[in-house]
């Protein structure tokens, strides 16, 4: 290991993998990636096998194993948050669902002063650069065809998927061929980061192919304990590996630790709310009260049904069948283990006052919780549902100068009347769809929440008890102009306001969370950041039309 690098990237997760690969494309750049977790070994079935996605969570070999402080509006429940502590970060342990969000998300990002380069037209070319979309035709102007992230469409060929899509139509919605294309609104097959029966993590797609370069070095099990400074200029980092402390210098340091670790390290380094830092004996370096604030996440629940016909994937949870399923995957990369099973779903508006979808549905032809707890039924299916734009906000604060002490954080789920109202709408919409005739041949009755949950108050009480994080923490170091006191990162450079040689590139800089899973937007931001950091001309914006309710015909872009 050298004593000095041009760039040190803290975190070998989703954003860090993109940055390590792209920045080291310039042979003149010496790049060091520091990852606190271990490597994502190619033989590790719990990472590489798509259907094993439920097993890394809660396992210290893969997961930081975070949890919130008691959520004040969920009867004091602590909500567990799995975050990838392994090369590839959360892209090595997530559900592999690829969703860009709605184009209007980026139109809203671009509205504040200084944010105009973040509209959909400016983001679209970076989405396309990262994608290799096997489910799109070569002339599809919305999708990329030559990027490192290989995407499988569907296939959603289990009969329960088609019945669910048809039920959505019967409930008054539409089918869409591609939720990442012209029209997000509607029901249809999803893209997943699965190729040839194997997970496509950011590290597998970006970092591993680049690691043969002499100017890129990746250190795993390297826990960064502090940033080093001369005044307000970052000069390098100190990290611990195998019990030994190392200090390395850099022209620039890039934080890509994610929405929990990046604000934590900033606060440990004296960058945050001055009063809070002083209370812990940390001398403030710069007062940035937005560090750790504006914290957003998606909360979700499972609406589960028993299935009357033996067509669900429920038998695959039988431990007696797992060895055969595993051998099918090991020797052929096929069978039940070769899919994440989140092969379809939909996006809808919960009422006519909403301009674009505010509810997301993931459909599963199986009834099982994310922790592996299966429903009491021989066969079953479920939808994961939750509001996408909750106006509840949380915060993250370190509670010690010790970098190994986990920070306190809370999301304040269900803290506003608007949030609660959307939750009631979400459950009613889900029940309406699941109660349609298209599902009658399979519908063996609701398991969860169950028929005893009917009134608005009962629904909210159930969400308090049963809601889980969708694992989309974001916005804790949000970007915005320096004139915005609560912004942390400059939107044109990703540099931390008031600091030199320090940038943040990960989910924490999102100004608002997007509609859907957030891994794709994080990759997009990292692709764009890499061009900015390298001094390259940004990709030209692509101004193409996309579906907007009330502007286009209600059936525009749909399929039968």
From Swiss-Prot:
Residues noted as binding FAD in the record, renumbered to the chain: 6-35
Gene3D superfamilies on file: 3.30.410.40, FAD/NAD(P)-binding domain
Keyword entries, A-Z: FAD, Flavoprotein, NAD, Oxidoreductase
Annotated active site: 472
NCBIfam families in the cross-refs: betA, PRK02106.1
Function: Involved in the biosynthesis of the osmoprotectant glycine betaine. Catalyzes the oxidation of choline to betaine aldehyde and betaine aldehyde to glycine betaine at the same rate.
Protein name: Oxygen-dependent choline dehydrogenase
Gene behind this protein: betA
